[in-house]
Amino acid sequence: MRDAGAITIIDLDWRPVLWADPAAAPERYRAAMGHASADVWTRAEVEIAVGEHEPEAAAAVLLALGPRLAVVKLGGEGVLVATEDGAEVVPPIRVEVVNGLGAGDAFGGALCHRLLAGDDPAAAVRFANAAGAHVVARLACADAMPTEAEVLELLGAAGAR
């Protein structure tokens, strides 16, 4: 599908208790990564998947496996976005954290939304980062999922458009 131009994204949620043999995860992750056009990971997940702790090195390994976009979420340090043209860290949007539940879901959905809209990877990640920030600043994760207007407002307030 990726080779036909479809956008396919792997955004795994590492839960070792769900694996009969957690040691098998890296091999299975690597097999799947080669089929996606974008890989999205947290720093901890990417280290499990490719054996690299440093985000830039991990992104290089991811890109070598085939995806055109590697995203490594760095928590309070922002998000690394990497393509064959280079890498940059999109800074975090500072909000008061109320509840972290749902932030990854908001990030993933917003990233898909903006990539499908044709945004360049860094712009899509900035938008996704703001969507995640919007959710963590609220109590109920499902009710906190932002509209596009709310994300754009937060980006504008942060000076991050």
Where are these regions (language model features)?
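Conserved beta-alpha-beta core of the PfkB/ribokinase-like small-molecule kinase fold
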Residues: 1-60, 77-79
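Conserved phosphate-binding/catalytic region of the ribokinase-like
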Residues: 3, 51-161
